[in-house]
Every structure is written in C-alpha cells, then in structure tokens.
Amino acid sequence: MVCCAAINAVRLLFKTSRKQFFSTTAGSLQTAVATQEIILSAGALHSPKILQLSGIAPAPLLTNIGINVTVNLPGVGENLQDHLFGLTLASLNPGIPANSDLVNATFDAAQRDLHYAKRKGELFPSRWTDTIAEALSFIPLYNFTKADLANNLISSIEANSTQYLHDSIDSAVVAGYEKQTALIASMHSKGSTAAMELLYVDGGRSVVNILMHPLSRGTVSVTSSDPFAPPAIDPRYFSHPYDGQVLVESLRFNRKLLATAPIQALGAIETLPGTATESDADILSFIKGVTSTEYHYVGTCAMLPKALGGVVDAKLKVYGVDGLRVVDASIMPLLPSAHTQATVYAIAEKAADIILGHSVEGRQYLVINPRSWDHNA
C-alpha cells in the first residue's frame, strides 16, 4: 500500500493466472503484483476512471475510445452525486466579532489566553474549533417549506424523474435511479431525512444552505486510452428541477431566519442576493451563479444489484472480476443527509471486517466520553 504518494494509477492488468497487476507511474512505469486482492480506493472521481481504463465499464464508452472490454458494467462512472449550496449574505452592526478577527495575531493571542485560563472569550465554546460555521442544523423538507409546497416537491420526485437523466444512460442504471427516487420521496414524506443543511457562518453574516438529496445525476468518463488524461467530469448540476426548487425555498427560509428578533438585534441586513431578488427565477439564477461543489462526490461505483446499475456487491467485490474490491465514497448509492467523511470512515471499518472475514457481532468498542476529559491536563 502506498499512501499520500505522487503516483498516478494507470490500469489494472488481468492475466489468465488470475494474478492481478497494478500499474502505476512515479516518473517511470512500475508494476506491482497482487498475490491476493486489489483494493481500489481512488475516490468517486478516480476509481471509475481506473476501472474504465482497465476495461471495466459500459461497453459503448470503451468501444468509442478503443479500450478492450473486460467486463461490460454499465454503472461504472454513472450516478455521480454531490452536495450543492446556496447562501445569503448579511451585514451586522459594527463590533460584532467576525471570523476575520482570528487572523489578527494580537486578538487571537488574547482570546487564546482567555480560553485556556477561564474558558471564556471568543474562542469558547464554539469558535475555538470554528473553520466554517458557529452552528449548523439538518432540516427536513416540511420544516422549512409550507406543507402544500413540500407535497408538490415530493410529487415531482415521484413523477418520472428519469426524464432528466442523460440520453445514453443504460436501462439498468435507470432502474437503479427509480429505486433511489422512490426511497428519497418516502424519506421526505416521513420526515426521516434532512432535505437541507443550514450553516450559520461568521456570526450570521452568511447563512449557507446545502442540498442533501439532489436528484440530478452526473457522470465520470475517460475520454481516451491515455491513462494520464483527466477524466471528463459532468456533474449535471440542476439537471433535475427539484434541486433548484429546494435551494430556492432554502434561501427564502434564510430570510425568515434573518428577520427573527435575536438576529435583527444584531442589525442584520441582507446584502446578497438582496431583497430586490424576489421571484423564484431570479433567486434560482443567483443560486446558480454562486453555487459550487462541496467535494462530497459519491455514487460512481455504487453498491447495488448489478441489474440496478451496481458496480460492487455487498462484499465490495466488483461484479465479474475476481479479487478486486472498491472501498471509498464511490460505493455509496445515495448521498447521506450528512457530510460524507464519517461515512467513508465507516465504509473503511466495515471493509476491514469483510476482507478479514470478521463478524461485527460480539465485537467490543472503546467508547470515549469527551465530557470526562481533564481539559486542564
């Protein structure tokens, strides 16, 4: 295993002896022999690329660029998902602490002294670990939209969402997407999942909304047999209208939040997009202009039945290939209504048990309660 090295994976080579070779480059072409298994953990953007270069991919894609088909697996590189965000910016009264204050060395040193000595100051309790937000929440659809609008949004999920997929998509991937949308609609109807994450940033100067369960689906595809060429990444953001509609309603919710008495007491005045931006079309246009990736890419080597566009089975094994597993965010068939980092940790933990043949039943875990720590030690 080579970690954090400047190595570019080229392809997996398959021999009749069933040994598998992992070719890499680090200035020169090198070959590593795997006597048991290969564990592919290149992430949701590069795991599908390596599989495609190895001939494990939708056959039409490989044929078009002259790569021999090892396994026709339509789901490789499909089902790309990402968390998108919109935001509202506001100005506050002078003197209210801002994140930029922590860049001031004198201020920062004084606040650190207060934090360590008295557990007081701007670093306590939340700003000590503040990198993005002072507070966040995960909000179900019915909690930030009116009931009739939420019902309409859920109906739009259930009403032929497949029309918004790209034209050349395989029928197996379409079938898997239909299962996904049915599950998303059910979770929203029950209120058992969040539709939006809200981040309260910089004392309220920025309120950020992140779409938890987008319906748009993108692709990752190699464009040639050149292993050093980057893959073509098409996230197809906003290709399903539901995604934009939820973010529009999220921004309207921000305005309600900024209008509450506690935040108005801070002198909050919306500055972006500005109160003149009122229609759904104008708000959506603004959101499309500011949105960007959250780098929460998942789904391109999904753990699903092969008939539903799956790439790996429940034991992380790639369909149709001996001794090859994928262990990274690409196996998630759906984005969680949360950040993906902890889920990736869980995937790795579970993968270790699967590969070693361990059962998680009866295992004992060390539970640490941070409240019991001696912070003065």
Each language-model region and where it sits:
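Short, glycine/acidic-rich hinge or "gate" loops at secondary-structure transitions
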Residues: Q264-A276, G362-V367
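A short, compositionally biased
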Residues: L12-K19, I132-A133, L304-K306
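Mid-to-C-terminal "cap/lid" subdomains and adjacent gly/pro-rich loops that border
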Residues: P58-V201, G289, H296-Y297, G362-A377
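A conserved short coil-to-beta-strand element within the FAD-binding core of flavoproteins
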Residues: V2-S23, E78
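C-terminal structured subdomain/cap of oxidoreductase catalytic cores
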Residues: F21-A90, P94-G95, S206-P262, F286-A377
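Short amphipathic beta-strand/extended segments with alternating polar/hydrophobic composition
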Residues: T31-Q36, D148-S155, I233-D234, T275
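Short, solvent-exposed loop/turn segments that connect beta-strands within catalytic domains
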Residues: L12-L13, T25-S28, T145-D148
